[in-house]
């Protein structure tokens, strides 16, 4: 029933690898070291084990009353196995992603049924998602730099607003209101805009104020996309070069770079969602920065169900390349800036281990996610600083509805942000 529903496909766009059947059950066969542990996997696993369970992103050092708040928006991910079911339930209840009959009853049923399999995936990557930890580290670095770059709008404070796990977007807004901020910046952590990611988070902000029946006490604006920011591009390029150097020197020029982004149902694309073009823009700028040293392709991961999605799919592309003798592959998560289930499980385990063995690949590695790279924190600070200096409420793109938009809330959200007074 679930896989046949076209409406469910929109929800699966956000859920991605979380809602897929694992390719393996239990322990997999031992893999060659280069397959099991890329630099990305080692760094992510080590950092998570030491820090993920102790980090409290909203707790920041005592300081002067904040003047400017930066709300870092993302889907989020369960930190523990016990949080998986609530995460899935909130996801299936999100009407920006899907509308179903008796949704309030069906969502808990679906979540409960999927929980054991998804918990197993999280168990395989250490017991939970590290995305909250990484967002906290990035936020700390960002506001420290912002206080130096923009003393007129300091002190700056970051807030984390997740859609499906705590701290929820609504909880973050309440904290921001209590803090008495003068200005609030909704800052999506997805470089490329999609209605199902950034759009859903911005809708949550509009809904919060609409439901409480009060106007904001702070002035809102938003950084709603940043696919070609120079420092973002530099970070990706640096991580690609670093990982390319781990391939045997005699094979290095043969490596195919596969930029992998979360796929999207074609029904969403055909409504005019700008996501595919913006991901392509990021890829183009990264390869331009690198000087086109290797062949490359943009591929799409996490397709679920029988309805058409953006392709080619990452796993099918890997199979096809190996069949054609291109067995040295570098995976680059181009739409994700922090490690989570789709990098640590789908790319590192499903593709780099299990699929690599099936295909007889020689070397499959993954470029490390941006995570704790100081240059990435500098990129975030520069984005916010430039946004403040521009005195703009949002990008010009945000004011344009998808030509075939079917969600009336999107129009109200756009009106909410474009009507703010700075």
From Swiss-Prot:
This is Ferrochelatase, mitochondrial. The modification N6-acetyllysine is found at residues 56, 289, 414. It is a peripheral membrane protein. Coiled coil: none annotated. Keywords: 2Fe-2S, Acetylation, Disease variant, Heme biosynthesis, Iron, Iron-sulfur, Lyase, Membrane, Metal-binding, Mitochondrion, Mitochondrion inner membrane, Porphyrin biosynthesis, Transit peptide. Homodimer. Homotetramer. Interaction with PGRMC1; the interaction results in decreased FECH activity. Interacts with ABCB10 and SLC25A37; this interaction forms an oligomeric complex. Forms a complex with ABCB7 and ABCB10, where a dimeric FECH bridges ABCB7 and ABCB10 homodimers; this complex may be required for cellular iron homeostasis, mitochondrial function and heme biosynthesis. Interacts with ABCB7 and ABCB10. Protoporphyrin IX binds at residues 114, 122, 129. Disulfide bonds: none annotated. Residues 1-53 form a transit peptide. It comes from Mus musculus. Binds 1 [2Fe-2S] cluster. Its cofactor is [2Fe-2S] cluster. Pathway: Porphyrin-containing compound metabolism; protoheme biosynthesis; protoheme from protoporphyrin-IX: step 1/1. PROSITE patterns: FERROCHELATASE. Its EC number is 4.98.1.1. It catalyses: heme b + 2 H(+) = protoporphyrin IX + Fe(2+). [2Fe-2S] cluster binds at residues 195, 402, 405, 410. It is an enzyme of class 4 (lyase). One of its GO terms (cellular component) is mitochondrial inner membrane. GO terms for biological process: cellular response to dexamethasone stimulus; cholesterol metabolic process; detection of UV; erythrocyte differentiation; heme A biosynthetic process; heme B biosynthetic process; heme biosynthetic process; heme O biosynthetic process. Erythroid and hepatic cells. The keyword Nucleotide-binding does not apply.
